[in-house]
């Protein structure tokens, strides 16, 4: 009797362990680490939205996957950088719309140790040529900082300009200009894309490409007034009025529909019902094994009363 309950306990613990998600200690980034109540400084007026469909190899299933993210751009703060990124978006649109839309090249070159995702060159210009073109990073506005996951910034290297998407609060080394924020799909970005398999230099083992891209410009009628209101909200926040700040809660998903789909999935795939079903089956076998003589003896004692 005692040995049976010991086996039952071991089976229960094994089911619980296998049903739990994998630990995230070895992940570069994880949305589980986010404090969804934390207030960050307000964002500037939005001048553009960019939707990017990213195709990559899922680090858990090793199958090809696609995720859609939305990036808000802040043209009232860094107009030159935003203009350069929009030109890059247009070039990718043209590439995807052409007959030879398939491209074996990588649209994302590297995953940094802190989980930041480095895009390929925005311009193919050399560093000398880039010096004569907008944006000149040292002359741009640097008041936006890398203080939250989802920040999008532009850097310069010997290959020209590149954009980087942050997945943590760790500041970037070197000079960069923050020009946008991921405002939808941040969860997939942190949990999936930032944790793809890479070599020792951070290069993804399988190419990460852009399968879809679109952009929309928001024409602000009173841009100067909107920017001044933002500066006032920012000043209030810096003076201690945290109500003027924002959280990242709404940035994790692609919208309420996505949240609903996730909720339905979790209800259907939650491990607890499976665990309880397994325990119920074990208990049923136990009852049958213990009381089998009584159960089967009763059935054998049934006598026919039919008259000959």
UniProtKB/Swiss-Prot annotation:
<dbReference type="InterPro" id="IPR029000">
    <property type="entry name" value="Cyclophilin-like_dom_sf"/>
</dbReference>
<keyword id="KW-0697">Rotamase</keyword>
<dbReference type="GO" id="GO:0016018">
    <property type="term" value="F:cyclosporin A binding"/>
</dbReference>
<dbReference type="GO" id="GO:0005783">
    <property type="term" value="C:endoplasmic reticulum"/>
</dbReference>
<protein>
    <recommendedName>
        <fullName>Peptidyl-prolyl cis-trans isomerase CYP8</fullName>
        <ecNumber>5.2.1.8</ecNumber>
    </recommendedName>
</protein>
<dbReference type="GO" id="GO:0003755">
    <property type="term" value="F:peptidyl-prolyl cis-trans isomerase activity"/>
</dbReference>
<feature type="domain" description="PPIase cyclophilin-type">
    <location>
        <begin position="56"/>
        <end position="215"/>
    </location>
</feature>
<dbReference type="Pfam" id="PF00160">
    <property type="entry name" value="Pro_isomerase"/>
</dbReference>
<keyword id="KW-0413">Isomerase</keyword>
<dbReference type="InterPro" id="IPR002130">
    <property type="entry name" value="Cyclophilin-type_PPIase_dom"/>
</dbReference>
<comment type="function">
    <text>PPIases accelerate the folding of proteins. It catalyzes the cis-trans isomerization of proline imidic peptide bonds in oligopeptides.</text>
</comment>
<dbReference type="GO" id="GO:0006457">
    <property type="term" value="P:protein folding"/>
</dbReference>
<dbReference type="GO" id="GO:0005737">
    <property type="term" value="C:cytoplasm"/>
</dbReference>
<dbReference type="GO" id="GO:0000324">
    <property type="term" value="C:fungal-type vacuole"/>
</dbReference>
């Amino acid at each position: 009797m005692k040995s049976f309950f010991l086996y039952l306990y071991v089976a229960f613990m094994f089911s619980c362990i296998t049903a739990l998600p994998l630990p995230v200690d070895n992940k570069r980034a994880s949305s589980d680490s986010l404090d969804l109540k934390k207030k960050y400084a307000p964002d500037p007026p939005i001048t553009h939205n960019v939707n990017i469909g990213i195709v990559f190899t899922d680090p858990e299933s090793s199958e090809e996957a696609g995720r859609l993210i939305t990036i808000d751009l802040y043209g009232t703060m860094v107009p030159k950088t935003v203009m350069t990124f929009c030109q890059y978006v247009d070039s990718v649109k043209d590439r995807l719309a052409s007959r030879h839309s398939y491209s074996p090249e990588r649209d994302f070159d590297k995953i940094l140790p802190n989980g930041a995702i480095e895009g390929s060159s925005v311009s193919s210009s050399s560093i000398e040529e880039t010096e004569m073109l907008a944006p000149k990073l040292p002359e741009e506005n640097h008041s936006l900082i890398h203080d939250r996951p989802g920040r999008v910034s532009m850097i310069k290297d010997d290959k020209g300009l590149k954009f980087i998407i942050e997945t943590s609060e760790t500041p970037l080394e070197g000079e960069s200009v923050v020009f946008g924020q991921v405002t939808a799909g941040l969860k997939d970005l942190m949990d999936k894309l930032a944790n793809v398999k890479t070599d020792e230099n951070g290069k993804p083992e399988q190419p990460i490409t852009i399968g879809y891209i679109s952009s929309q410009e928001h024409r602000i009628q009173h841009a100067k007034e909107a920017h001044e209101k933002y500066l006032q909200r920012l000043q209030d926040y810096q003076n201690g009025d945290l109500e003027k700040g924002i959280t990242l809660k709404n940035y994790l998903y692609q919208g309420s529909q996505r949240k609903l789909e996730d909720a339905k999935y979790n209800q259907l795939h939650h491990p607890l019902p499976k665990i309880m079903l397994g325990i119920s089956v074990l208990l049923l076998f136990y009852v049958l094994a213990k009381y089998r003589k009584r159960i089967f003896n009763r059935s054998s004692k049934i006598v026919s009363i039919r008259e000959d």
